[in-house]
Amino acid sequence: MISDSLRIRIGDSDAMQPAPGHMPVRQAIRWLSAYDSPSPAEGMRVFMTPSAYVRCCAHAGSDLMHEVGGALVGRWRMDAATRQPYQVIEAVLPARHTRHGPAHLTFTQDSLVALNEDLEDRFPGRLMLGWYHTHPRMGVFLSGQDLWIHEHFFPEPWHVALVIEPVTRAGGFFVRDTAGRLDPHAYTGFHELLRDGRGSLRVWTNLRQEVVVEEGGTG
């Protein structure tokens, strides 16, 4: 574990508020998990750019014997019309100097310092929105140690945790509900942003595409 004296610095969180924005639902495909309702979620909605998704999956697949992980970087917004919070993950920062094994990943002090330096140097003006790590051959869930990391280093209501199972190609986000609770097994899908008319890059086979019924359609 890591000392509480060193936390991932994400800005002045006490005074931080999401900037107004327009949720880009029409520019994205919504992927649902078995725990998701087809109706719009009430809590935080997660959008991910193609480049961030590809790089995250590439890092996850780089070691199928040990857990790897890092930070999710991007913007935190609130839809001006619906007042619903959402985040756009634009990049990932693979963590260096970690201690890892087949069933554990620990961020060291050097890991946290490097993540903060990389955030400031490479992505000024962006936030650390959460973290990701892999569970090779173990499934998509948050272990007791994962929950400890999330609660101590990603305590804000808008922080998310992404777990990827690279062997079976599965993945899912863990998002706190409006009361601040987090279910370590009930993961959610995400909104995959599409760019330049290109199709989906999704490789996680445990998620299904949302079926959108146009207004006035018969379904």
Where are these regions (language model features)?
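Conserved beta-strand-loop surface patch within small alpha/beta domains used
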Residues: 1-128, 137-219
